[in-house]
């Protein structure tokens, strides 16, 4: 039996192509949704871009028929702009205020009631990214779903960048003697390029080692940087060791680091960037950026000069730089950075759209980027540059993103089989016991 899917505005603003995601079913867009989309077209951010894209898609579909009737889609389904079924009679005793959310609920509920009177009535399902809209729908007896087509993977299945590998003492001897072993010698295991193997004794002994798959995924090699001490820090756990290996390898220009606050992502990335920029001269500049304000905003509306506006948003970066430079007095770090000149701390707004060659680029809080934003960013990376995306997918500030459809998760999953990239999920916090407990419990 076919179904009727009523789309909320946030679904279209998250994915303009959502109307093509419902196979051979009917897609209904309430008129109020078009009004909300229209109000967002002037925005110069991702939401505005998607609003303009949706408008163009729907306009193109006008050529196939009348939008208030049934326009055929390539999926085998149909699209309809719903101008009627706006009565609040079924909602007024529960939701008195005529907000746009409630108007969308009214359309879906009235359509559902109409279908119930038919002999072969179809299920009506409201699709929304808004949790409270789905809760309201349930309260009035209306089927509701989240839009899941934009999710790259289930949370428990997100690529960690490593896996346990139990091997024999003979293979341990071969690994330490030849600095590598063939994946063919490890039964029932396959590896992505640059995926780590946490090797353990299959008989329960104390032997252990960490290897990394080569570019073909057929050989496990010893780490190049397995005991590094850079800029006064060294890895405190095996995940940090693996992260540092990726950060220091010139042949891996894309690195993704996932972890909660306190797992060492920012400190390790900054130390690796400083080493390769200031000490080794591999890169001409170290650029650190993060998306700093809610969607649809910019720091231009804040008072003060650019540096004054950036300071509060970028303070976590400056805190780590103060630690690495051992800056203890107020203003000392500013003087150090001004003297060096090759370290640039920016809002993401200021580097997006530029070509970025020969630079070590760190993007913090990358979980707040959309797929389009992260694509735009990566396609601007110039020759000879390395880019590090890091963040915690469980800490999303973007209104239309979640832990499974954000730009960081998207890159991790899409690039996990590519020889130019590597990823590590850091699990252990290295701050105080209180900080780790707070990250786990709160």
From Swiss-Prot:
SMART domains: PINc. ATP binds at residues 259-266. Keywords: ATP-binding, GTP-binding, Helicase, Hydrolase, Isomerase, Magnesium, Metal-binding, Nuclease, Nucleotide-binding. CDD domains: PIN_VapC_PhoHL-ATPase (cd09883). GO terms for molecular function: ATP binding; GTP binding; helicase activity; metal ion binding; nuclease activity. Residues 3-135 form the PINc domain. It catalyses: n ATP + n H2O + wound RNA = n ADP + n phosphate + unwound RNA; ATP + H2O = ADP + phosphate + H(+); GTP + H2O = GDP + phosphate + H(+). In the N-terminal section; belongs to the PINc/VapC protein family. In the C-terminal section; belongs to the PhoH family. This is Protein PhoH2. It comes from Bacillus subtilis (strain 168).
């Amino acid at each position: 039996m076919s179904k009727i899917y009523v789309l909320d505005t946030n679904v279209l603003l998250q994915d303009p192509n959502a109307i093509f995601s419902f196979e051979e079913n009917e897609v209904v867009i309430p008129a109020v949704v078009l009004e909300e989309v229209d109000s967002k077209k002037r925005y110069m951010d991702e939401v505005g871009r998607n609003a303009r894209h949706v408008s163009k898609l729907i306009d193109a579909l006008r050529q196939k028929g009348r939008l208030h009737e049934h326009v055929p889609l390539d999926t085998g389904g149909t699209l309809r702009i719903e101008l009627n079924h706006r009565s609040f009679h079924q909602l007024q005793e529960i939701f008195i205020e005529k907000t746009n959310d409630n108007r969308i609920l009214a359309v879906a509920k009235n359509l559902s009631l109409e279908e119930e009177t038919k002999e072969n009535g179809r299920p009506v399902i409201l699709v929304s990214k808004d949790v409270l809209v789905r809760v309201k729908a349930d309260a009035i007896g209306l089927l509701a779903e989240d839009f899941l087509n934009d999710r790259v993977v289930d949370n428990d299945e997100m690529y960690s960048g490593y896996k346990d590998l139990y091997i024999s003492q003979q293979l341990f001897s071969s690994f330490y003697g030849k600095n590598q072993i063939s994946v063919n010698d490890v039964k029932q295991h396959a590896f992505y390029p640059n995926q780590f193997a946490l090797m353990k004794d299959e008989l329960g002994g104390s032997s252990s080692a960490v290897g990394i798959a080569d570019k073909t995924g057929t050989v496990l090699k010893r780490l190049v940087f397995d005991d590094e001490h850079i800029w006064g820090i060294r890895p405190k756990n095996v995940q940090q060791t693996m992260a540092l290996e990726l950060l220091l390898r010139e042949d891996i220009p894309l690195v993704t680091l996932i972890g909660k606050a306190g797992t060492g992502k920012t400190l390790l990335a900054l130390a690796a960037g400083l080493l390769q920029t200031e000490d080794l001269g591999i890169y001409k500049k170290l650029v650190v950026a993060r998306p700093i304000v809610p969607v649809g905003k910019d720091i231009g509306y804040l008072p003060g000069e650019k540096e004054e506006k950036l300071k509060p948003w970028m303070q976590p970066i400056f805190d780590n730089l103060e630690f690495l430079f051992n800056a203890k007095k107020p203003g000392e770090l500013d003087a150090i950075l001004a003297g060096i000149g090759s370290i640039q701390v920016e809002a993401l707004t200021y580097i997006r759209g530029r070509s970025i060659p020969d630079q070590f680029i760190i993007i913090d809080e990358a979980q707040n980027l959309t797929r389009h934003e992260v694509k735009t960013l990566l396609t601007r990376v110039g020759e000879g540059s390395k880019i590090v995306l890091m963040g915690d997918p469980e800490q999303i500030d973007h209104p239309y993103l979640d832990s499974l459809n954000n730009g960081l998760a998207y890159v991790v999953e899409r690039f996990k089989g590519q020889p130019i990239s590597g990823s590590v999920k850091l699990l252990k916090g290295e701050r105080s016991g209180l900080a780790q407990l707070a990250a786990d419990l709160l």
